[in-house]
Amino acid sequence: MSTSGKLTLITGPSGVGKGTLVNQLLERHPQIWLSVSATTRSPRQGEQDGINYFFHSRAGFEALVEQGGFLEWAEFAGNCYGTPRGPVEQQMAAGRPVLLEIELEGARQVRRSFPDGFQIFLAPPSFDELERRIRGRGTDSEDAIQRRLTRAREELEAQQEFDAVVINDDLESALNQVETLMGLG
């Protein structure tokens, strides 16, 4: 299967290693275009518009929602996040493989508007290992950790909705599986 002009989506619970896997994938396959999300939150130190996120006012974001400008969008912690439709469609039309790294609810929305997209669920080897990884970050309060774990349980229950499930036990092995699923040589 060729990934040329195809949409692939990767999702999975917080702490499963989506970001690490996607960064490695992009390093190995620079032809892949990673979608940049839009948000209403303020830029953090060092973040650039159009590189890290497309930064919008609440009104500007809502106008794009009304115009059907997002493949998916959601509100989280008081801010809106979404995947702009235009750039994704432009890259696909140009024949580039497109990759989205988004959360479960966004993946479900993309499936409705892009049923031909290939969806991969990245899963931990065990729930205990996922908890160890989340705690190992050392950045969250116990309350935040418990919220992440509760959400992770819900997300893991949804993995059968996806075209493929890849267990991220060993990064190299998981990368090889994703490359095979995406048809990358």
Curated annotation (Swiss-Prot):
Residues 5-183 form the Guanylate kinase-like domain. Its main location: cytoplasm. InterPro entries: GK/Ca_channel_bsu, Guanylate_kin-like_dom, Guanylate_kinase, Guanylate_kinase_CS, P-loop_NTPase. GO terms for molecular function: ATP binding; guanylate kinase activity. ATP binds at G12, P13, S14, G15, V16, G17, K18, G19. It catalyses: GMP + ATP = GDP + ADP; dZMP + ATP = dZDP + ADP. PROSITE patterns: GUANYLATE_KINASE_1 (PS00856), GUANYLATE_KINASE_2 (PS50052). It holds the Pfam family Guanylate_kin. One of its GO terms (cellular component) is cytosol. Pathway: Purine metabolism. Keywords: ATP-binding, Cytoplasm, Kinase, Nucleotide-binding, Transferase. It is found in: Cytoplasm. Its EC number is 2.7.4.8. PANTHER family: GUANYLATE KINASE, GUANYLATE KINASE-RELATED. Essential for recycling GMP and indirectly, cGMP. Belongs to the guanylate kinase family. This is Guanylate kinase. The lineage of its organism: Bacteria, Bacillati, Cyanobacteriota, Cyanophyceae, Synechococcales.
